[in-house]
Amino acid sequence: MMGVCMLLGACQDVTPGYLQTEYAGYTMDSMVVKKVLDLTPPVPNPTFEMYVNTYGYTPEYCVQNGIYPTIGGDEYKRDKYGWPWTSTPIEGVEGTRPIFVSIKSITTELGNAEKMWEVLKVSGDGTFSMPVYSDVPVGRYRISLTFTNEGYTQDVNDCFTIIVK
């Protein structure tokens, strides 16, 4: 009887679930944020029109091969619709749900980390977002994250770079 009581008491010390971040990372581990946007309205792409109208290719085929219906104004729609700068989600984080993510630190040599703290957001899948316009100065910003779930906390250091230019 005493052995059963000891066995049951020992089970209470086990932390439920797990959290693994040793393979965590971003497919694209950096993002360029432009201070000066190209707001030129896009114009029709003559190459796209030639492929579709003359050669008979479908618009879908052209887009899949990097030939788009318009050219120019790379940030025109970003400005017009207020689309934020966004990263890809982080990959390789495994564990018992829910897993919470937060920014652990932001480091920079030339920029201003405090200003980046004010505008940078991270969502539950590790996607970073910044508003189209901000007062973050030019520089390279290294970001570290903290992942937390029930009973576990792990850091992923210097996992993403934001280049403001």
Where are these regions (language model features)?
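Sec-dependent signal peptide recognition
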Residues: 1-2
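C-terminal motif of bacterial Sec signal peptides marking the signal peptidase cleavage site
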Residues: 6-10
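Non-catalytic macromolecular-recognition regions in eukaryotic signaling proteins
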Residues: 12-165
